[in-house]
Amino acid sequence: QQLFPQTQAIFLFNAGRSALMLGIKALNLPPGSKILLQAFTCSTVPNAILWNSLTPEYLDIQKEDFNLNPDILPQNPVAKALIVQHTFGQPANMEKITTYCQKKKLYLIEDGAHSLGATYREKKIGSFGDITMLSFGRDKIISSVFGGALLVNNKNLVKPVENLYQSLPYPSFSWTAQQLLHPPITFLSKKTYSFYLGKLILFLSQKTKIISKAIYPKERDQQTPPFFPRRLP
């Protein structure tokens, strides 16, 4: 809350993709509606769109920062929303993108998975969109193995998000145990990796589901794993 004092509400989830999935659902878009996003992205982003029975529409990126190219945004979009990604923590051109969404009356969703703490013209990334997804996965700025948050900046979306959020179950004991075991097992694996033992420890731990994977096989087939979405206490 101190990092984002302007936000209307913050909701915590078991993963960034859970936050994005529920945030998109709260927009209450008609089935099949299109959402604009850049093509260079993690598979979990278009999955969150598809899991809501919506359609991703991919756009090209700029070579210099791997972010969405605002100069090729469609002039007559049929889309209802746009997801802007701040790739590798480099802020996208929020001046052009925000103006575009306001002019075309599109919901603006920020993917802040890489960019917690970044700013664009002295304004924090995450404070531009109607909603913003943050990720606390094992490869993010703040890691809790799995975890995420949804910032709601549009006051009209607070109640829809809250209603959906309260209907979610908490993560199971077994899933939580997997995440708690991840740090000590990966620590042991790294210490013995040069002897090939660490690689075996990591492989067997994931194979036997003692620890979790960052991306699950079901997700690669655009299927929803049973433990997404979940809220945190």
Region locations from a protein language model:
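PLP-dependent aminotransferase-like
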Residues: 18, 25-119
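Residue-level preference for short coil/turn positions at secondary-structure junctions
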Residues: 6, 31, 77-78, 102, ...
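Short glycine-biased active-site loop of nucleotidyltransferases that positions the nucleotide triphosphate
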Residues: 123-126
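Structural signal for conserved beta-strand scaffold positions within catalytic alpha/beta enzyme cores
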Residues: 12, 58-60, 134-135
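Short loop-beta-helix segment that forms the pyridoxal 5′-phosphate
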Residues: 1-23, 37-39
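Short acidic capping loops at alpha-helix termini that bridge into adjacent secondary structure
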Residues: 8-9, 31-34, 159
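Active-site region of PLP-dependent enzymes
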Residues: 116-121, 131-146, 151-233
